[in-house]
Amino acid sequence: MGFVLICTCPPSSGVVVSQLHHHQFSAGVKSNELWFRPTRRTLISKSSCFNLPQEPILSEALKEPIAFLGGMFAGLLRLDLNEEPLKDWVTRTVEASGITEEEVDADGVVSNDEDSPQQIEIE
């Protein structure tokens, strides 16, 4: 019995090798090309391709998961958040989370006139 682990990381980041019951599963790699020869019942993985703190979308989604999933659901169904039933739900969700406009302003999410698109004239 063995395990096959597929990693989408760059090849220079490490090699994943599995060895169980005296059989070596190298996924087409010759045994002399393997970097590691683990002991019995060992699975080694050297690198990680996913780092949650560096993913701002996921870190924000984990703060308010129900609001995030509701927004995703509304976006997938192309619902208008300004219509009455959804507008009430969004208002209640924002009030329940305790987020104020001042906190949003302090985070720098406010759009300034300098950052907004400017109108240009082409002759």
Swiss-Prot record:
Question: Transit peptide where, by residue?
Answer: 1-26
Compositional bias ranges of the Acidic residues kind: 100-123
Specify the superkingdom.
Eukaryota
Q: What is its main location?
A: plastid
Q: What are its GO cellular component terms?
A: plastoglobule
The entry's family comment says: Belongs to the UPF0426 family.
Can you say what this protein is called? UPF0426 protein At1g28150, chloroplastic
